[in-house]
Swiss-Prot record:
Pathway: Cofactor biosynthesis; coenzyme A biosynthesis; CoA from (R)-pantothenate: step 5/5. It is an enzyme of class 2 (transferase). This is Dephospho-CoA kinase. It is found in: Cytoplasm. GO terms for cellular component: cytoplasm. Catalyzes the phosphorylation of the 3'-hydroxyl group of dephosphocoenzyme A to form coenzyme A. GO terms for biological process: coenzyme A biosynthetic process. It catalyses: 3'-dephospho-CoA + ATP = ADP + CoA + H(+). Signal peptide: none annotated.
Amino acid sequence: MLVLGLTGSIGMGKSTTAKLFAEAGVPVYDADATVHKIYENEAVPAIEAAFPGTTLGGKVDRALLSAKVVHDPAAMKRLEGIVHPMLRAHHQQFLDDAESSGAPVAVVDVPLLFETGGEKRVDAVVVVTTSPEVQRERILARDNMTPEKLDAILARQMPDAEKRKRADFVVDTSNGLDPVRLQIREILEAAAKMPRRRD
């Protein structure tokens, strides 16, 4: 089974692209959805111990946690030290299940793929992109998003131009869904002929 790593900076259309891969019959692992799941289950005790007052009703309160880590690189590292091992276990379970199902290709949707060295764990990388103007417009339309919070998030992410340079495939979401569907079909055709290269 070939594993495609799907990534892209915030607001690029990565989640929509992931849904379109799933629509094409490809198993898709969603790292963000997995984070939400573990914030409601196994990560709660460790996060409350490391960041007191960030859980409510037995779940991690993302807004409270974000306020404690967004401007503190050391706190962010501590949080990643708690969450990343749990994510890796879920990720491996997904791959095992996808392989058992006989899927020829699987997609792992990981926002910080390059930033966390995740490109070594996939066979090819798909980077989702759009223009900086469209990106900013999409992000600032979200609830609880401010220009300052956006700048802090972007500062932690590899620049889009660098991601595109390191990609095997680039999906441009600037022109609507039909062009994205076509790009996905082309990627899946090319992926069928690629050798496996992950660690």
